[in-house]
Amino acid sequence: MTKPTYILIREASNESGYTAHPFPSEKAAYTAMNCMMKSDTAAIETTYHLTPRVEQVSNYKTRLIFDAIIAESDMTVKITYSVFEVK
């Protein structure tokens, strides 16, 4: 029996496409997700002086939501992180 792979997917509403990263364990995938969330949060807080709302969408999906007025237009950026098990 082969061990499952865990895929971390990051999608942002202000970017086209997504990124996917494989991990050998669920713990490694969630550790990487937490690092990505911290990095994205720091980048937005530094650039736009905004703090995100964190929304737990389901057991495997977490979303950061940044509401802002950028370039004189209302803009909501949603960054979603998902971890899936692939057997």
Q: What positions do the PLM features span?
A:
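Short stretches within intrinsically disordered, low-complexity N-terminal or propeptide regions
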Residues: 14, 22, 31, 44-45, ...
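Intrinsically disordered, low-complexity segments enriched in proline/serine/threonine
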Residues: 6, 24-26, 54
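Residue-level signal for short segments within beta-strands and strand-turn junctions
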Residues: 10-12, 24, 49, 85
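Intrinsic-disorder/low-complexity coil detector
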Residues: 3, 21-23, 51
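Short, flexible N-terminal segments of the mature chain
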Residues: 19-41
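Short, mixed-charge low-complexity intrinsically disordered segments
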Residues: 38-87
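Short aromatic-glycine-(Arg/Gly/Cys) micro-motifs in beta-strand/loop hairpins
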Residues: 1-19
